[in-house]
């Protein structure tokens, strides 16, 4: 825990200007308030898209806070030079595009169904396949960027155990346990979770079906590995090499926007959790600890929600 606190103190004292943090918080409070007060994205399903227009809108939802974060950084640190760099513009536009295309698999759902086994397990196979394809959509373009730009400079954006220590992350995960348990009593939480137990017509109450639910939970967790890799790996380690600590809070703003539609508490906490994990990822050069925390919290949310459903 001392390492976590020490890293946070060092960032707050030496890297962060209070005005920058305050402006980011004001912007994100307004952005989240407008979304949850007026339900601006209710008509847009952030997971399943039927038109190119929906994907473009999702891209803009991600791009907007990411761009504002960098604009605020430039304003408070008087660093407008990065806006004259073609590489910055490429990364600024490229990153939200890659993440918004995760849902591209849904354009081909009928084709995928035709290739998978039929019967009661069809939806199970589809959801597992969708997880793999969504993650490949992230990994492949970012891997090509790393191969061209950073292969000789760093491991694959945080996929390393060098400088990694498990203990601080286990402490963080332990702190999250009572928070998740308390959240699990909220109606909006139980409306969202457990996500892994919607495999109609399979039923968790049927002993013959139960194995499919737990297999899917493994795939569900696989998804979080690559979300962590994208946000704390690519968006920080690739950007930090060129733009320094200014990349941290714009990443957190972007990260909040992917939580729209989820319980409000989860969306708010994503900013602070993403920032803390981001500081540690930059300090260690590894996303391994972030994966432990993110995956552990995700499965904990599934498990606590399941207990409420079956008890």
Task: Name each region found by the language model.
Residues 67-75, 138-152, 222-241:
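Transmembrane alpha-helical segments in integral membrane proteins
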Residues 248-311:
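Functionally important transmembrane alpha-helices
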Residues 26-37, 95-105, 176-186, 252-260, ...:
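Aromatic-anchored segments of alpha-helical transmembrane domains
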Residues 158-170, 226-250, 279-286:
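Membrane-interface helix/loop boundary segments of multi-pass membrane proteins
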Residues 21, 60, 89-93, 168-174, ...:
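Hydrophobic alpha-helical transmembrane segments
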Residues 100-137, 143-223, 311:
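Juxtamembrane helix-loop-helix connectors linking adjacent transmembrane helices
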Residues 5-24, 49-56, 77-98, 118-131, ...:
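Interfacial transmembrane-helix boundary/kink motif in multi-pass membrane proteins
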Residues 36-70, 79-147:
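Alpha-helical transmembrane segments in multi-pass membrane proteins
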